[in-house]
Structures are given as C-alpha cells and as structure tokens.
Amino acid sequence: MSGQTTSEYISHHLSFLKTGDGFWNVHIDTLFFSILAAVIFLFVFSRVGKKATTGVPGKMQCLVEIVVEWVNGIVKENFHGPRNVVAPLALTIFCWVFIMNAIDLIPVDFLPQFAGLFGIHYLRAVPTADISATLGMSICVFFLILFYTIKSKGFKGLVKEYTLHPFNHWAFIPVNFILETVTLLAKPISLAFRLFGNMYAGELIFILIAVMYSANMAIAALGIPLHLAWAIFHILVITLQAFIFMMLTVVYLSIAYNKADH
C-alpha cells in the first residue's frame, strides 16, 4: 500500500471495476469471476464424468462422487417431488457459490496487483461479496419458487394461497395478501443479504489484516498468525455459506411444491 493512506487502501480494495455510473452500471470484475467460477465447476465435473470408471476411482472422482451423493441425499430428504431438476440445481448452487467464496482465500493484493500490470486499477475478485451478484442469484430462486408453486397448485391455487392464508375468510384478503407478499419477498432478500454480509465481512477482515503489514515490525509480525488463523476459519465460513444458500433454496422449493393445503 505504498503511497496510500489506510483509508485509501481500504477504499481501493472495495472499489469495483465497472462501466457507467450510478445505479445502472455493470461490475465487470463480478461478472468475470462469476463466469470463471462456473467454467471451473463445469470443467471439473465434465472431465470427471467423461473419465468416470467402475474400477478404482481417482481422488478427484472420489471427491466429486462424495459431493454429488451428499447433495442428492439432502435433496431427497427435503424435496418431496421429482428431483430431476432440483438435485442438479442444488449441486450447481453449492459448487458454484463455494468456488466464488473460495476466491476470498487468495491474498487480497495478489489479483489487484496482477490486474494492475494490464492497466486495470480497480478489481474485486469475490463475486459473492457483491450484493448485485447475490441478489441476482436469489431473484432466480424467487422465480423458481413461483414456478413450482404454480406447477403444483395451479394459478388458482397460487391466488388462493396468497389471499386466503393464514386467515381463511374473504374479509381478510387484503391482510393475507400483505402478509404472504412480505413472507415471499423476505426469502430471496434474506438469501442475498446473508451470503453477501458474511462474504463482505470476511473480505474486509482480510483487508484489515493486510493493513497491519504496513505498520511497525511488531504489528506486522502479529498479522501473519492472524492471517493464517482467519484463513483457516474462513474455509468453514465459505463452505457453510454455500451450504446454507443451497439448503434454503431446496427448502423454499419444497414448500412451494407441497401439494397439501395449508
């Protein structure tokens, strides 16, 4: 952080590479690393799928099989309907979010400095620390909730659910509609902000630890064990947040698909 104050250093690391100003702008770094994470996921799983063998599997095949069976077991326990779409969706969500989260383990200065060699002055590499990315994913989940609700109950069932629940009387239709709308909207919003909040906080802590290296020798020496300890703990955080996003998606879709009347 030579030539920068602490506040300038932190502000620089929290600035996006973007086009445009104001609300209507595109975070190029978020898009790039989101797509990169998806490509890594597709490459690894397609490669393992092509080389899958009934004999003694390799380490990567074992890992992929464990993850697939684990996710399929979770979907089987929580989603009581056809799993041909939900199970692959859950697997994709978990692996994709995990890979995006794992980018946070790369030292905070490495990627921005590398990008600086190509004249790129701002770069945030963790897509899930960008609220626009997490909101985008949660909005997709929101539309899937509506789709599975209509698929299982029909459009009339959807209208009935949002007008006659929890109070089954025509006089309470406005109250029911407000309550159910708030409940429905709270699902994608909570999904987005939970993932964003945890990853943003994790990224900020890494940046604050990096600031310690520019202080005196005693504080800089303290930063090394702190960095290592937080990185180890953060492995749990990135895995847990990927699991929570996947799990809540499956649960929300299961509730939407439930054919039983309330």
From Swiss-Prot:
Its main location: membrane. It is found in: Cell inner membrane. GO terms for cellular component: plasma membrane; proton-transporting ATP synthase complex. The keyword rRNA-binding does not apply. It is a multi-pass membrane protein. The keyword Cell membrane applies. Key component of the proton channel; it plays a direct role in the translocation of protons across the membrane. HAMAP family: ATP_synth_a_bact. This is ATP synthase subunit a. It comes from Haemophilus influenzae (strain ATCC 51907 / DSM 11121 / KW20 / Rd). The gene is atpB.
